[in-house]
Amino acid sequence: MKKLLLVLLTLTVFNTTLVAKKTKVDTTFTFQNFVPSSPDAVKEFHRTKLLGSSRIEYPSFSGNNQVVTAMNKEMDKFINDFKETKNYVYKVTYSVTGNNAYFVSVLFNVERKNKTTNETLTYNEAISFNAKSGKALLMKDIFVQNYESALNAAVNDRVKQFGITTLDEKKRKFEGVDKKQKFYMEDDAIVFIFNQDEATDFGDKQLFIPFILTDLIGLLK
């Protein structure tokens, strides 16, 4: 009888372990039940890397091993785009604009210097991460299917509110947001980035279009 109970207990433990291994945590990104004030998902550490004569400041992350490993890998790949080339050298700084239980977002300020003319172009790049998986977030990850028309209508309305004249030339026409749109997120907002020759000739020719997340209910996942 004791042997039988031992066998049954062993089988129960084995089956429980097997079920646990088969059960995967859903890491799909969603804003459902989103709490902007939720605790930071990761800890951020300032890093500086020299790639040739390019100087790149960027964050590395610590926390959940599996998640931060993915984030740091994505970040290394991202900053590699700023390595010195035959024609250009880069100076890059950053700020972490959002860090909560749902996402981590980083905004980069980039100065690209032409090594021949010494002319400097300043622009912005950004990368955001799913705090559950560590994967970089794209537009398709945060917006529902077929979001483009409704979102661009909201973007155009916001541009009109700002009173900004957008590019309307054949080769330089403002087309609104697209699938590869640059953006960064704050804990309660998303900001779309348009660098020079992408949206306007006004001021420094860069355009940032912000939306409070609650303004986009119905479009966000």
What are these regions (language model features)?
Residues 4-13:
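Sec-dependent N-terminal signal peptides
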Residues 20-221:
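Compositionally biased intrinsically disordered regions enriched in Thr/Gly
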Residues 13-19:
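C-terminal segment of classical bacterial N-terminal signal peptides
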